Amino acid sequence: MEFPEHSRHLLQCLSEQRHQGFLCDCTVLVGDAHFRAHRAVLASCSMYFHLFYKDQLDKRDIVHLNSDIVTAPAFALLLEFMYEGILQFKGLPIEDVLAAASYLHMYDIVKVCKKKLKEKATTDSTKKEEDTSSFSDKVECLSDGSSHMAGDLPSDEDDVEDEKINILPGKTDLATESRNMWIRLPTESASIPRTVGEAETHTTAAGKTAVSPCSSTGSLSHRSAISMGDSADVDCVLDLSVKSSLSGTETMNNSYLSSQEILRNSLVQVKVEKEATCDKNDIDTTEYDIERNTVKESVSSNIRASYEPVHLAPIREDSVLRELDHDDKASDDDMITLENERVQMEANTDNSLLPYVPNIISPTGQIFMCPLCNKVFPSPHILQIHLSTHFREQEGIRSKPANDVHVPTCSLCGKTFSCMYTLKRHERTHSGEKPYTCTQCGKSFQYSHNLSRHAVVHTREKPHACKWCERRFTQSGDLYRHIRKFHCELVNSLSVKSETLGLPAVRDWTLEDSSQELWK
């Protein structure tokens, strides 16, 4: 007579005994963490423990695991799986579980983790494509509306009437794109008299979304009567060729320039210079122009005015795809000036950071704005250093546990960890602390597993034996490499035989998956 629930009842009893410490005959050390368990269960679920306990069983009360590969939370999760048959990640990074399972040769768990990582990567790529496509549709819709808005604005009397700027979408070569974008905010500029037409335009735009002063669809301005020094143009040039221009609304909201009092006597002008071959003597310092082949600023102004959070990568990609065709035959005379528009801000704009603005503006009245986070800096050199932090943050960020507000973070390098134990172990790399000392020779080590590995030098012990040829090794890694090199075909034949006999999958000790994970 068969009892279907017998195996489940047996696992439940073993799990209760482990929690009570009853009949536990071994201790697994992962760094400073101790785990009591039963040898039979460990050897049945892990090829690593099976080889460890096969020889000299009575001398294997304590097992040291490599804490650089196996973390304490990951081993606790795998230990629960051994006793309960249920795998629950509990917010732990899948990469940590995968590394621990590969180290312990638990290949069923390795396959599950690889599958989850593959599904996660597929989901992220699909979501990114959907976001990009929806963003492109939104940009096309807003660009049509912005082109009509630009037609209603008055044009400058000195420029040609009814002049149109054709915006052609398409990919352009990044090497020929506009370079040296800079932003200037003079704090002491004479107020320019407003004409009747400008006053009407200002009144009409008060109830609508503010049009960006750096938008290519904005109306043309009068020539500025204020002259700037020639040296100022050289100092404020910064290479930001890949970044898209910022809208006026986004600039004012996110860089602490949200007060109408400051904007009343401020002139926001953006200049996108052409190729580096332009003669500096031909640049008129009394005029701050913008070239006709600039990007669609009206699109970015409409999108950012709606305060919708948009990921940086789609904005960059869309701005590059929608830049105008570069006209190599265009001369410097084709440049047009911007209008000195008064930007209307929302009544609920946050003014808490406003007092910091005068302190960061240089004595010459220039500030330099980051196109990624809209922070302002007094010099282009400081801005360049700040920009490098954005690109460092995009690489090497370890995934954080889900629903974990207090993530252990290193105060020196900012690296995050899954638990406080791994953080403390990481801090030794900065302090150089070596708390583990050999009693035989007095040599110190940073990690306990290094001390255990060193102890074999004095004992000349070779605890790891090959079950096929009885050859012995000092380290488990040497044994593993030996099995791969000399007995790989034998292991594969045994795994095929196990499948034919219908043996439990947990004892199927193939080396295909773990060999790629640990020993590349």
Swiss-Prot record:
Subcellular location: Nucleus
Stretches for region Disordered: 121-140
Xref: InterPro entries: BTB/POZ_dom, SKP1/BTB/POZ_sf, Znf_C2H2_sf, Znf_C2H2_type
Any one GO BP annotation for this protein: regulation of transcription by RNA polymerase II
ZnF bounds (C2H2-type): 368-390, 408-430, 436-458, 464-487
Ranges annotated as spanning the membrane: none
Keywords, comma-separated and alphabetical: DNA-binding, Metal-binding, Nucleus, Repeat, Repressor, Transcription, Transcription regulation, Zinc, Zinc-finger
Domain (BTB) ranges: 24-91
One term of GO molecular function: DNA binding
Entry-linked Gene3D superfamilies: Classic Zinc Finger, Potassium Channel Kv1.1, Chain A
GO CC terms: nucleus
Presence of the UniProt keyword Lipid biosynthesis in the record: no
Function text: Transcriptional repressor that plays a role in various developmental processes. Specifically binds the consensus DNA sequence 5'-[AC]ACATCTG[GT][AC]-3' which contains the E box core, and acts by recruiting chromatin remodeling multiprotein complexes.
Similarity annotation: Belongs to the krueppel C2H2-type zinc-finger protein family. ZBTB18 subfamily.
Protein name, per record: Zinc finger and BTB domain-containing protein 18
Protein's organism: Xenopus laevis
Gene giving rise to this polypeptide: zbtb18
